[in-house]
From Swiss-Prot:
Cofactor dependence: pyridoxal 5'-phosphate
Keywords: Lyase, Pyridoxal phosphate
Catalytic activity annotation: D-serine = pyruvate + NH4(+)
UniProt record similarity statement: Belongs to the serine/threonine dehydratase family. DsdA subfamily.
Origin organism lineage: Bacteria, Bacillati, Bacillota, Bacilli, Lactobacillales
Designated name of the protein: Probable D-serine dehydratase
Family annotation (HAMAP family): D_Ser_dehydrat
Domain of life (superkingdom): Bacteria
Residues with PTM N6-(pyridoxal phosphate)lysine: K110
Amino acid sequence: MTETLLKKKLNLNDQFLLNLKNYQEIFWKNPNYGDELPDLDVNRETIFQANRRLERFAPYLESVFSDTKRSKGIIESPIQRMDSIKDLLSVKGSLLIKRDDLMPVSGSIKSRGGIYEVLCFAEKIAIENGFDLKKDNYQDLRKDKYRKLFNQWRIEVASTGNLGLSVGLMASTLGFKARIHMSHDATDWKINKLLQNGVEVKIYDDNFSNAVAAARVSSQRDPYSYFIDDEGSKLLFAGYATAGERVKKQLSKMQIEVSKEHPLVVYLPAGVGGSPSGVAFGLKLQFADAVIPIFVEPTHMPSVLLGMASGLNHDISVYDIGIDGKTAADGLAVGRPSMIAGKYMKDKLFGIATVSDSDMFAYQGMLKKLENIEVEPSAAVGIRGLIQSKEISEIPDSATHMVWATGGSMVPKNTMHKYEDKAVRIFNTWKSE
């Protein structure tokens, strides 16, 4: 693709394109942002039914995952206040953090979508083989009859790490064979965790988008393979969107008002864009124009920003404009956005901020030092959106801000210590600037 043709197709001005290619921290405000939910094939009823399905599975989940006993099989994370960071950054409204780093089973936001799609497939296979939704107990799915049935199938997915963990752990627990296709960005501890749970891992010396393509071909060759498509799955999206109903209940219990006068501004890390888009969509269903979603991406991997700003969405990769894709944010290391992100977020996403790796580590150090919150580096980038919000006139002083932490509790202690030693050092320097 020539530079002239590229510029014409991208419909981006020269300075904006130059800033992207020079890895500048920028903010893109979505010119199509609006409040009306269009008529889409994933809608309010889809998400309502997804929440009810997860409730039906709760007794089973409680019986197989000890970390869900407290919540009686509901896989959800807490919300907490961050008063020390609020003071440091002089945030006018309330500051909260959504602790998806503490999500049961796989310790990340991917527990929402990945586990949900595996459960959907398990339910489908069980029903086709005599399971009665109205009469049978979901705990019966632990029986040999169903485990042998599930073991005839292999579930496959491509992942940089966290989605692979959620799909692999849920699939293997039910009795499915699981194969996780991982790009070169995947970290060793995530690979080892999967292997320890009997999950097959294929590692590609290639980027995420090409790993997805390879995984898709692998699955198509096997009639007993079920492929979970991180670039286009509506079931994954629905699983992420269940967060909206849960967050509404949590905020109500905390007596936090969400309204046009007191909007909720949510800062979500974005890689391929599926999980933040699903969460944002679910929040929009609950709060409409009283919620303002903002994504945050690495300066070296602004895939959703490039896709949405250009209008090309899934049809363009950061590599097409010469961006190198090199980032320590392994969970966000995706060069091409999902097919769903641009479509469902076209008028639902307020904007996207980009963040340098150095600032990302500073925010991780900030969370550790000031709030004693331990997350993996990519889970901390929402703070960049929070800082950017001070320059956004549409966000009033009365807003409630929510940084969405996307992963961290599964990180081995020695790995986390290495992350945090570096992060706190960078934060100490960052703070004095």
